[in-house]
């Protein structure tokens, strides 16, 4: 059990028999009335996102989630194959469980897999990943119609917006949570 004061991003709650992870939360103390906590929850299995409000101090059932270090090996049809670093067992995780994170997965990348009762819930990549630009058009000096950015295709196939000075073959640092360009990596 966790109180609303224990809420943090990534905490997995068990509500009405389903697992929900906290994406965002905000403690609110209005001028009148009792304090409450406004949350945005994501259903772990279906991916559905809902807004839910809890009264301050309410106890909520939490789920026991184990985080295991694994290495991404390869993509096989609609499954992604990971290897447990401790037991060397290979684990197959569905595309729907990996979700949008697959855009930045590279072979032999170290990740964390969250499981509940040995069922994979979600995959957490490192916050920043280093990827090589496979293709981007040359940036023209003075071209500001796109706000100083242009599209670039990375080695994983993901497409992100990068500054005009980025060229094909450059190694970039990218935020794996939202796909934002963070900087160029010096080789």
From Swiss-Prot:
Localization terms from the record: Cytoplasm
Main location: cytoplasm
Pathway assigned to this chain's UniProt record: Protein biosynthesis; polypeptide chain elongation
Species: Rhodococcus erythropolis (strain PR4 / NBRC 100887)
Keywords assigned by UniProt, alphabetized: Cytoplasm, Elongation factor, Protein biosynthesis
Keyword Cytoplasm included in the entry's annotation: yes
GO molecular function: translation elongation factor activity
Identification of the protein by name: Elongation factor P
């Amino acid at each position: 059990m966790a109180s609303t004061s224990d809420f943090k991003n990534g905490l997995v709650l068990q509500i009405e028999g389903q697992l929900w992870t906290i994406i965002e939360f905000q403690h609110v103390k209005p001028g009148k009335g009792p304090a409450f906590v406004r949350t945005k929850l994501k259903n772990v299995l279906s991916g559905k996102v809902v807004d839910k409000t809890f009264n301050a101090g309410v106890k909520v059932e939490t789920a026991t989630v184990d985080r295991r270090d694994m290495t991404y090996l390869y993509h096989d049809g609609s499954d992604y194959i990971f290897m447990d670093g401790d037991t060397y067992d290979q684990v197959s995780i569905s595309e729907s469980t990996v979700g949008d994170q697959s855009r930045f997965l590279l072979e032999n990348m170290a990740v964390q897999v969250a499981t509940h009762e040995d069922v994979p819930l979600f995959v957490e990549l490192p916050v920043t990943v280093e990827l090589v630009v496979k293709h981007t058009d040359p940036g023209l000096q003075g071209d500001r119609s796109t706000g100083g950015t242009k599209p670039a295709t990375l080695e994983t196939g993901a497409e992100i917006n990068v500054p005009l000075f980025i060229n094909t073959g450059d190694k970039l640092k990218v935020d794996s949570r939202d796909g934002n360009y963070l900087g160029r990596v010096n080789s």
